[in-house]
Amino acid sequence: DLHRVDRRQRQMCIRDRFMTWGESHGEGLGVVVDGCPAGISLCEEDIQKFLNRRKPGQSKYTTPRKEDDRVSILSGVFEGKTTGTPISMVVYNKTQRSADYSEIAGYYRPGHADYTFDEKYGFRDYRGGGRSSGRETIGRVAAGAIAVKILEELGINVCAYSSRIGGINIDYNNFDLKECDNNAFNMPDSNAAMQVEKYADGKLKEQDSMGGIIECVVTGMMAGVGDPVFEKLDANLAKAIMSIGAVKGFEIGDGFAAADSTGSTNNDSFTIKDGRIVKKTNHSGG
């Protein structure tokens, strides 16, 4: 019964720590995951299926750089199971073209970390953004794949999708997660995806880009994970998401819309359902 899960299982959800490393045009990028419990079934294919979803060059709307992004597990796994020791994984860069970036060595790109890297370190790797490249997320995805394995054992499921791109919102009446695999924008609404495709084609011609919103939903999560103040679960989630390059906002539940609400309508009341304490609403996002 996940609702009577013991303290060790609760802590197992949050004790993993990871550190990413590598640069966009270096030999490779990777991650070290520390704190993973022993005995979890894990192989490279468990990681690869998630990396295949994020690898570049899969549509005309992403970077034209093409990489296989094949992962190798270097440590922490023996005979198909985690050993409880740090898990190290690496993806080697294969098609980096550093000469393409020689022109920007002497100036700063807007919306990038070029200027701040120079200010902080007095030196920067200008090739593809170096450490600040979007390829840094390779390590996050690999670590997340391990987290998925752990969470699945506890009956916890995580899904994410694009809910808004270029000012175009999905219609929740047309919501179908299977549609995410049928369009280049990971949108669960085929009509919205078609509108975004038309909009994106226009931005391609203008040599411009566009922003969007990603929603993430977690089901099966037990109560009581996290700490009361500085290690609040929502605080740690916000820090994790805001550390991703280009992310400029984070909401849980109704988020900023709660500012226009009242306590009587925003606060989630409790009730009893099937012998369990549950909330009548979910404005707080769990």
Question: What does each model-found stretch correspond to?
Answer:
Residues 20-21, 27, 207-286:
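Glycine-rich anion/phosphate-binding loop at the beta-strand->alpha-helix junction
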Residues 24, 28, 39-61, 136-137, ...:
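Alpha/propeptide regions of enzymes that mature by internal proteolysis
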Residues 51-110, 114:
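Glycine-rich, N-terminal phosphate-binding loop and its surrounding beta-alpha-beta segment
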Residues 51-59, 95-97, 119, 150-158, ...:
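Structural signal for hydrophobic packing residues in well-ordered secondary-structure cores
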Residues 119-229:
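Glycine-rich, mobile lid/loop segments that gate access to catalytic sites or pores
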